[in-house]
């Protein structure tokens, strides 16, 4: 399979999340689902290390799911095996801030320009869900955001939207052929079992990703 058949590309170089009415935003805030996951239990990453393609190739297999974000300066690759444990990567490239986000329960990978009003917003996973999608929280203002739209629905930044960054969903084999000079998110230090997905496996039948049942 080629990158074009596997990738979901957001043509959103200058796109921004569509505003909602205050009534719609209030409805979101009233329908959040408690998951038992507390704020801080899923640690986000801040300006993590990256490997070159040839170094990352030693630990990634060609059929593994990876995500690509087109940041300033070029493509960056984010292995799903790492993103599932952290869900948010806060990055700064040439003084430009980005939030690289992944929600395993909806299977959405989104990247945003997170510079706003002179601030570089830093995001974490808040722990609750809306319609199975992760709720994000920024450390700067404490506002709550939808992961799949980049829209603030509660807090001082209510109604604000983050510009989207183009992303791809593909495999490691396709990614390294198409972007041979990309930087690849390196395995963080720590004892998390990065080779194991707590939600299942995209390549194996009968796991979470092959199940239409509502989990939350």
Segments predicted by a language model, with ranges:
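N-terminal signal peptide c-region/cleavage motif recognized by signal peptidases
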Residues: 10-12
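Mid-to-C-terminal functional-domain signal that highlights helix-capping/loop sites
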Residues: 15-216
């Amino acid at each position: 399979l080629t990158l074009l058949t596997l990738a979901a590309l957001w043509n959103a170089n200058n796109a921004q999340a569509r505003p909602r009415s205050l009534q719609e935003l209030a409805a979101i805030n009233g329908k959040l689902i408690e998951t038992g996951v507390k704020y801080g239990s899923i640690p986000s990453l801040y300006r993590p290390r990256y490997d070159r393609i040839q170094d990352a190739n030693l630990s990634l297999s060609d059929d593994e799911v990876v995500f690509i974000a087109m940041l300033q300066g070029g493509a960056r690759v984010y292995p799903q095996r790492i993103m599932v444990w952290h869900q948010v990567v806060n990055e700064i490239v040439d003084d430009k801030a980005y939030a690289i986000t992944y929600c395993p329960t909806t299977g959405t990978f989104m990247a945003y320009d997170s510079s706003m009003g002179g601030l570089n917003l830093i995001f974490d996973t808040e722990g609750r869900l809306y319609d199975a999608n992760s709720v994000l929280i920024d450390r700067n203002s404490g506002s709550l955001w939808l992961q799949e739209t980049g829209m603030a629905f509660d807090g001082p930044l209510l109604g604000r939207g983050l510009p989207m960054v183009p992303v791809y969903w593909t495999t490691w084999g396709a990614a390294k052929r198409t972007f041979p000079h990309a930087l690849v998110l390196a395995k963080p230090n720590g004892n998390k079992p990065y080779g194991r997905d707590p939600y299942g496996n995209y390549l194996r039948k009968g796991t979470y990703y092959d199940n239409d049942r509502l989990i939350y």
